[in-house]
C-alpha cells in the first residue's frame, strides 16, 4: 500500500470522526484501539501498558516547566537551548525528557533538539486540563499504585467507607480526602481545575428546562441552587444557553473552593456545606453535578435529606451523574468509578442503585435521560408520593 493510500484512509477517518456524534466518536476510538493492539507484539503490549504512569509524569513535568504553554504561544519551533534558558534545567536531563515527551506525542519533534506543539500540547496548555492532570497525578496516582496491595490485604472486599479506603493507606492519614485537601491549598486548586474542565456534551443542551420551568413565579425567586457547584461552571453554562431565564442562580460550595471562583454576571456565590440544612427555600431546581459519586450511600442519603425540607411543591432535585449500564460500560465511566472508590470510597451507580438511594432518602426518580456516550445522565427526583 502506498503512502498516498494511507493518507487517504487517514483523511477519511478524520472526516468521519468530525461529522459523527458523540456515540460515533466513541465507536471510532474503540476500533482504533483494537487495531493498535492487533498490530502489537507481546513485548509492545507490555511496554505500552506499563508506560502509562510515566506518560502522566512526563505531562506533569511539562506543566511544571511551562513547556506546553511555551510551545502553544510560540509561532516557531523552540530548541532545547531555548528551553534550558527558560527553565534553568540541565541540558542533558531536559534533552532526555523532551525527546521522551515527543516519543509519546506530548510534543512534536521538528528537527534535532527542536520542538513544536502537538494535539496533546494544545490540550494541556489549557489551565483546566493541566490542573486536572496535576490533580490526577498527585492524588489518584499514589492511590492507584497502592490499590493491588490494599485489595489483597482486605481479601478483596467492598470499599464502603471514605474513612477506610485506599487514600488513607496511600497518604498515611486518618483523614478523608475531603478533610485532608483543605490543608493542602495547591491540591484544592488543582481539584477546582478538574471540576471546571469542560466536557464535550452539556446537560443544558439536553434537559428540557423550559418545559420543566412551567410558570416560574418571578425574577426575584431562586431558579436553581447549584449545590457543590465549584467555580459555577454549570450555572454559567445555563445562563449562557438561556440568558433570558427568570430567577436567580446561586452556586454553593465551601470557602476554599469559592476562593478561586471568578465572578460572573447573573450568578451568585454562597458559602455552604451540603451536609448542613439547605438555607435556600422553594427553589425550582436543586442541582448537583458529580457530588454523589464522591460519597458512599450513607453520606449521599444525608446530603439529600438536607435538601428535602427546603423544597417547595414544585421543586425538583436534578442529579447530573453517570448511570452505569449493565453491559458495555465505557472505559471513561469504569475508570472514574474506580478512581472514586480509591480516593473517596465513592461509586458510579447503576439505575437500580440510584433508585435504592432515592428510596432511602424518601425521594423517587420521575425522569431520567442519558445525554452522552459516557453514560452521563440527568435524573429528576421529587419527594416520594404517599
Swiss-Prot record:
Substrate binds at residues 137-150. S-adenosyl-L-methionine binds at residues 228-229, 253, 273-274, 289. GO terms for molecular function: demethylsterigmatocystin 6-O-methyltransferase activity; protein dimerization activity. GO terms for biological process: aflatoxin biosynthetic process; methylation. It catalyses: 6-demethylsterigmatocystin + S-adenosyl-L-methionine = sterigmatocystin + S-adenosyl-L-homocysteine + H(+). InterPro entries: COMT-like (IPR016461), O_MeTrfase_dom (IPR001077), Plant_O-MeTrfase_dimerisation (IPR012967), SAM-dependent_MTases_sf (IPR029063), WH-like_DNA-bd_sf (IPR036388), WH_DNA-bd_sf (IPR036390). Signal peptide: none annotated. SUPFAM superfamilies: S-adenosyl-L-methionine-dependent methyltransferases, Winged helix' DNA-binding domain. The active site is at residue 293. Its EC number is 2.1.1.109. Pathway: Mycotoxin biosynthesis; aflatoxin biosynthesis. Residues 177-197 are annotated as: Substrate binding. Catalyzes both the conversion of demethylsterigmatocystin (DMST) to sterigmatocystin and the conversion of dihydrodemethylsterigmatocystin to dihydrosterigmatocystin (DHDMST) during aflatoxin biosynthesis. Belongs to the class I-like SAM-binding methyltransferase superfamily. Cation-independent O-methyltransferase family. COMT subfamily. This is Demethylsterigmatocystin 6-O-methyltransferase. It comes from Aspergillus flavus (strain ATCC 200026 / FGSC A1120 / IAM 13836 / NRRL 3357 / JCM 12722 / SRRC 167).
Amino acid at each position: 500500500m502506498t503512502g498516498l493510500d494511507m493518507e487517504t484512509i487517514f483523511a477519511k477517518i478524520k472526516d468521519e470522526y468530525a461529522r459523527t456524534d458523540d456515540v460515533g466518536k466513541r465507536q471510532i476510538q474503540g476500533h482504533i484501539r483494537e487495531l493498535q493492539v492487533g498490530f502489537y507484539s507481546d513485548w509492545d503490549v507490555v511496554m505500552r501498558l506499563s508506560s502509562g504512569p510515566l506518560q502522566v509524569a512526563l505531562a506533569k513535568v511539562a506543566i511544571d516547566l511551562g513547556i506546553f504553554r511555551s510551545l502553544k504561544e510560540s509561532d516557531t519551533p523552540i530548541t532545547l537551548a531555548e528551553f534550558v534558558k527558560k527553565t534553568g534545567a540541565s541540558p542533558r536531563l531536559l534533552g532526555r525528557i523532551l525527546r521522551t515527551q515527543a516519543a509519546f506525542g506530548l510534543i512534536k519533534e521538528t528537527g534535532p533538539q527542536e520542538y513544536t506543539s502537538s494535539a496533546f500540547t494544545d490540550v494541556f496548555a489549557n489551565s483546566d486540563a493541566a490542573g486536572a492532570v496535576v490533580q490526577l497525578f498527585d492524588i489518584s496516582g499514589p492511590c492507584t499504585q497502592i490499590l493491588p496491595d490494599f485489595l489483597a490485604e482486605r481479601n478483596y472486599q467492598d470499599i464502603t467507607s471514605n474513612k477506610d479506603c485506599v487514600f488513607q493507606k496511600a497518604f498515611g492519614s486518618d483523614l478523608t480526602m475531603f478533610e485532608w485537601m483543605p490543608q493542602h491549598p495547591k491540591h484544592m486548586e488543582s481539584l477546582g481545575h478538574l471540576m471546571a474542565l469542560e466536557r464535550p456534551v452539556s446537560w443544558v443542551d439536553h434537559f428540557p428546562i423550559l418545559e420543566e420551568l412551567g410558570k416560574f413565579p418571578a425574577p426575584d425567586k431562586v431558579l436553581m441552587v447549584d449545590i457543590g457547584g465549584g467555580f459555577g461552571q454549570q450555572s454559567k453554562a445555563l445562563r449562557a444557553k438561556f440568558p433570558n431565564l427568570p430567577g436567580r442562580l446561586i452556586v454553593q460550595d465551601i470557602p476554599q473552593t469559592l476562593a478561586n471562583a471568578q465572578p460572573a454576571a447573573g450568578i451568585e456565590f454562597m458559602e455552604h456545606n451540603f451536609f448542613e440544612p439547605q438555607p435556600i427555600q422553594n427553589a425550582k431546581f436543586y442541582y448537583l453535578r458529580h457530588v454523589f459519586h464522591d460519597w458512599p450511600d450513607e453520606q449521599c442519603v444525608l446530603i439529600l435529606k438536607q435538601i428535602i425540607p427546603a423544597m417547595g411543591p414544585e421543586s425538583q432535585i436534578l442529579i447530573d451523574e453517570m448511570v452505569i449500564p449493565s453491559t458495555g460500560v465505557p472505559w471513561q465511566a469504569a475508570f472514574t468509578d474506580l478512581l472514586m472508590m480509591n480516593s473517596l470510597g465513592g461509586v458510579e451507580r447503576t439505575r437500580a442503585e440510584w433508585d435504592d438511594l432515592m428510596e432511602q432518602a424518601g425521594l423517587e426518580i420521575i425522569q431520567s435521560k442519558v445525554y452522552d456516550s459516557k453514560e452521563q445522565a440527568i435524573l429528576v427526583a421529587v419527594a416520594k408520593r404517599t
